[in-house]
């Protein structure tokens, strides 16, 4: 993971935390445990960075729902 994608992951963790009213540490654990960071956010960084954070948070929610991750 390069510096740009790392910063993007941190930004998206905070965006999800704000929308879900959760602590960023909680969101990080859920995203890491589900593989969302390494299998979805980082590989799709180039595409995702051009979308709004609301759209990306929705995509992350869909990713987690498909894997039966609750939060």
Give each language-model segment a name.
Residues 1-71:
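C-terminal alpha-helical interaction appendages
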């Amino acid at each position: 993971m390069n510096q740009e994608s790392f910063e993007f992951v941190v930004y998206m963790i905070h965006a999800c935390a704000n929308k879900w009213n959760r602590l960023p540490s909680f969101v990080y654990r859920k995203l890491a445990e589900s593989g969302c960071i390494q299998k979805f956010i980082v590989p799709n960084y180039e595409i995702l960075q051009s979308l709004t954070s609301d759209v990306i948070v929705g995509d992350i929610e869909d990713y987690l729902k498909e894997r039966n991750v609750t939060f």
